């Protein structure tokens, strides 16, 4: 099972707009410059804040449609969309199974014989809530409801199942989760219905988890339509130090359509395998799959009757990875989220066919290997995927500021690129008046280096008029751009991309000097 995102619907504003249901709600995102001026009028019009850091408000769709032209005319409107519904999809191949069968996956992921740590990095399950009266969660320590949980049997079915795989305790009943001592946090996205999940609640849940501090955020949900606001919430969480783990989807035998949030950058995407350690037919294939974990005929806690049952779907392989990631992070607290991302997937055990592939990514989750895997290079400026991520007034998330400034005119860093998850790194630099600036990238891989002028909107312009210089020679090693002096100082942008067609991941060093 995986929560399914219903097709996106833009809030039409023209004279031929389709009929908007009378009870519909909309999400309005203000521009950064308009936040102070427009917040109070929106609240007075009946809006509620969804994510203050993202400047997102929820209000009746009819009101949003009435206010939108004025907001747009005042350059105050960044995004407007209907608050869409999400719903739990049908369970794939569900069948009753003895509780002992729940343990088959434990040896597969390398935790037999290992002692899990005590409570540490939290796992936030953004889902349909947890049945806190279920035997697995009744009086369980370190179980936190971040908002009210819809009581069973109306709510909590999907979320209870997911959370039980993260951390069902050793309590003498039922199953044992991958990390039985985990700190489990739950954000119930299905309040008021129990089956329908709102986009606004997903955003609230991701934001609440990120605001609580670095941890693992489990998203066993998805859909075929890209949603800018959910993507921004994920980017913000990643910038604040959290690891977002998402289900690849259950359409492997239905043509493998795009699936979000699984296909977003900076999301650890999980497919599902069966008891034979082969990728399950339903598990969605895509270049964005990072690793797989058991997800077929896995016994979980169920809120329907406070019991347990066998379930199948990437919804259930995903929390196994989330719990494992929290275990590894607790045992290796010196890692940041960018390093943990790499550790979890690069330590995976390859499954046929050999090498990285669309079905299994890097392979099967291996907790023992992840605990021992060498720490990779940190990638501290992420997410920095384009100009709008690093501009100070963009409302995006790079918290480290520009590489160079008027006062600091030299810099050096080490970072990492990924052809699928992180193909572009952008940095803001200061070009002082009447001085040349040398930008140098060094890598064992073939990276391309470009420097863009202050008017750049996006580095995807290619060879646009804002390009100040480029070194895109098709070879590994040293790349350099020297920006010629100009009469006045100005801001510019450095772009580093992975060139050629070979290799998925590359580390590089970048220096800026006069």
Explain the meaning of each model-derived region.
Residues 360-361, 372, 408-514:
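Acidic, Ser/Thr/Pro-rich low-complexity intrinsically disordered segments
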Residues 163-166, 185-190, 215, 247, ...:
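Hydrolase catalytic cores
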Residues 186-266, 276-279, 285, 304-318, ...:
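Substrate-binding/access-modulating region of protease and related hydrolase catalytic domains
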Residues 27, 81, 122-125, 176-177, ...:
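Structural recognition of the beta-strand scaffold that forms the well-ordered cores
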Residues 205-220, 228-229, 233, 240-242, ...:
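C-terminal subdomain of the subtilisin-like protease fold in secreted/lumenal serine endopeptidases
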Residues 72-122, 130, 134-136, 383-402, ...:
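Protease zymogen maturation seam
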Residues 18, 36, 40-102:
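Autoinhibitory propeptides
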Residues 98-185, 190-191, 201-205, 211-212, ...:
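Active-site core segment of subtilase-fold serine proteases
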